[in-house]
From Swiss-Prot:
The active site is at K80 (schiff-base intermediate with d-ribose 5-phosphate). Its EC number is 4.3.3.6. It catalyses: aldehydo-D-ribose 5-phosphate + D-glyceraldehyde 3-phosphate + L-glutamine = pyridoxal 5'-phosphate + L-glutamate + phosphate + 3 H2O + H(+). This is Pyridoxal 5'-phosphate synthase subunit PdxS. In the presence of PdxT, forms a dodecamer of heterodimers.
Length: 293
């Protein structure tokens, strides 16, 4: 089968705009996510909070689990491959996954190369902490971006940092002349054509979601107000006291992110949020956001 063009894959990712994508580890959780209004689910064996707690090498999930989740829902199913592990990505494409997340939540397989995403029919989503990482991933064929945040912490501070970094750098680009854009492209190691396009249009050529540490409806609305196109929620739903109610609330807050009254209403009586971790208490070698380059 012919490989999809990058433009087609970007169009597929655009269809998720304004929505919430939820991490699920069972078909039952996937059904809960779909009923709550998720636009897609991320099929995993372990949510990031468990990967963080249990340590060891985190790899692609068992294809059998991913297929069981695919059969349980009608919405798109995403799955994660390790950074640089193009064979895991080939397997995920072969079993019919709708989107592949080349994810720093899993243990990187290659410390020098990300996957060449142009070789795949399936759209890829990748994490980024700044505009340089964003444009390098797009150059490799990513059809969708997300903040890296710090997954599995229930702490939104890194996602906020990464979103603000990308958008402030885009605003900076818009004030640069052509010579400055050439220099800037070299500094951030990104193709000049992409840098020029972003400077001209004032936005990324792909959708950019927030991910990492989003635990409450207010967290989701905060990132949406900062300018992201949608929300990934990992451990924040099924590690909380009332997953069904919290899932619905986060979807509502993402849709009505500019309406504090609705956010206040859906935030009532959600039960315990997931237990959070302060970023400065995490040893440097355990920080997931630093994986990838």
């Amino acid at each position: 089968m012919e490989k999809s063009t990058w433009t087609t894959k970007v169009g597929l990712a655009q269809m998720l705009k304004g929505g919430v994508i939820m991490d699920v580890v069972t078909p039952e959780q996937a059904r809960i996510a779909e009923e709550a209004g998720a636009v897609a689910v991320m099929a995993l064996e372990r949510v990031p909070a468990d990967i963080r707690a249990q340590g060891g090498v985190a790899r692609m999930s068992d294809p059998e689990l991913i297929l069981a989740i695919k059969q349980a829902v009608t919405i798109p199913v995403m799955a994660k491959a390790r950074i640089g592990h193009f064979v895991e990505a080939q397997v995920l494409e072969a079993i019919g996954v709708d989107y592949i997340d080349e994810s720093e939540v899993l243990t990187p397989a290659d410390e020098e190369h990300h996957i060449n995403k142009h070789k795949f029919r399936v759209p890829f989503v990748c994490g980024c902490r700044n505009l340089g990482e964003a444009l390098r991933r797009i150059a490799e064929g990513a059809a969708m971006l997300r903040t890296k945040g710090e997954a599995g912490t229930g702490n939104v501070v890194e996602a906020v940092r990464h979103a603000r970094a990308v958008y402030s750098e885009i605003r900076r680009l818009q004030s640069m002349n052509e010579d400055e854009l050439f220099t800037y492209a070299k500094q951030i190691q990104a193709p000049y054509e992409l840098v020029k396009q972003v400077a001209t249009e004032g936005k990324l050529p792909v959708v950019n979601f927030a991910a990492g540490g989003i635990a409450t409806p207010a967290d989701a609305a905060l990132l949406m107000q900062l300018g992201v196109d949608g929300i990934f929620v990992g451990s924040g739903i099924f590690k909380s006291g009332n997953p069904i109610k919290r899932a619905r609330a986060i979807v509502e807050a993402t849709t009505h992110y500019n309406d504090p009254e609705i956010i206040a209403e859906v935030s009532k009586g959600l039960g315990e949020a997931m237990v959070g971790i302060n970023i400065d208490q995490i040893p440097a070698e355990q920080l997931m956001a630093r994986r990838g380059w």
